[in-house]
From Swiss-Prot:
The lineage of its organism: Eukaryota, Metazoa, Chordata, Craniata, Vertebrata. The chain crosses the membrane at residues 25-45, 100-120, 129-149, 179-199. It is found in: Cell membrane. Residues 46-99, 150-178 are extracellular. Residues 1-24, 121-128, 200-219 are cytoplasmic. It is linked to Deafness, autosomal recessive, 67: A form of non-syndromic sensorineural hearing loss. Sensorineural deafness results from damage to the neural receptors of the inner ear, the nerve pathways to the brain, or the area of the brain that receives sound information. The gene is LHFPL5. The keyword rRNA-binding does not apply. It comes from the Eukaryota. GO terms for cellular component: apical plasma membrane; plasma membrane; stereocilium tip. This is LHFPL tetraspan subfamily member 5 protein.
Length: 219
């Protein structure tokens, strides 16, 4: 007859594997969060949210706060705008979108800064703090992406994209890679947030009741 491991020893083995797997997933989550922050910073800074096409009257492209539009008399692009130069941003919708995307970016960066709390606070609590921050970041990115097209009816955008351009109607222009990444980043932030919540609750239950030792009784 095969003798099984004592309940206490089996619980220790399960606990060791449980902790090891949780740490591996935690490292993966942290690495993905850092990579995601770089992605969000890039799409925030780059002015390639919408741009020209072969049918546009002029060449150019627009971002959240900066844009470049071709000169009628030459092929040179005239660039304007900056994150602190609100007067040069073409529309209120662009300003609002910039605010919410920036909010999402800083929340993601803030969740990375919270990694330092792992050394001084309860691990489960830190995961949950980061999860809420990443969920809020996803909300900010989503609002930014929804509001941004509301500014397509500005005079600067219409000058480049044509008179058919209006709110949520891009005319002859096309969506560029930064806007596409911003839309995809909403899902990324939600996945990271969900993963952080799972890790937080796993930390709360590192040793489930079913595996708690109930003495040295052998079966």
């Amino acid at each position: 007859m095969v003798k099984l491991l004592p309940a206490q020893e089996a619980a220790k083995i399960y606990h060791t594997n449980y902790v090891r797997n949780s740490r591996a997933v935690g490292v993966m989550w942290g690495t993905l969060t850092i990579c995601f922050s770089v992605l969000v910073m890039a799409l925030f800074i780059q002015p390639y949210w919408i741009g020209d096409s072969v049918n546009t009257p002029q060449a150019g492209y627009f971002g959240l706060f900066s844009y470049c539009v071709g000169n009628v008399l030459s092929s040179e692009l005239i660039c304007k705008g900056g994150p602190l130069d609100f007067s040069s941003i073409p529309s209120r919708a662009f300003k609002t979108a910039m605010f919410f995307v920036a909010l999402g970016m800083f929340l993601i960066i803030g969740s990375i800064i919270c990694f330092s709390l792992f050394f001084i606070c309860n691990t489960a609590t830190v995961y949950k703090i980061c999860a809420w921050m990443q969920l809020a970041a996803a909300t900010g990115l989503m609002i930014g992406c929804l509001v941004y097209p509301d500014g397509w009816d500005s005079s600067e955008v219409r000058r480049m994209c044509g008179e058919q351009t209006g709110k949520y109607t891009l005319g002859h222009c096309t969506i560029r890679w930064a806007f596409m990444l911003a839309i995809l980043s909403i899902g990324d932030a939600l996945i990271l947030s969900f993963l952080a919540f799972v890790l937080g609750y796993r930390q709360d239950k590192l040793l489930p009741d079913d595996y708690k030792a109930d003495g040295t009784e052998e079966v």
